[in-house]
């Protein structure tokens, strides 16, 4: 189970790293819009 648990987080990390790029651009904008 330990070996299966490791590959899981590794696959989830790249998926989350690719999403933040698009989310950061949208959030940013939103954060700047809200801060303004």
Swiss-Prot record:
Signal peptide start-end: none
Recorded GO CC terms: aleurone grain; vacuole
Subcellular location(s) of the protein: Vacuole, Aleurone grain
GO molecular function: nutrient reservoir activity
UniProt keywords, alphabetically: Allergen, Seed storage protein, Storage protein, Vacuole
Assembly mode: Monomer.
Family: Belongs to the gliadin/glutenin family.
Primary role: Seed storage protein. Serves as a source of nitrogen, carbon, and sulfur for the young developing seedling.
Protein's UniProt name: Avenin-A
């Amino acid at each position: 189970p330990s070996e299966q648990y490791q590959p899981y987080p590794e696959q989830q990390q790249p998926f989350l790293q690719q999403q933040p790029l698009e989310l950061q651009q949208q959030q940013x904008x939103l954060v700047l819009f809200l801060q303004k």
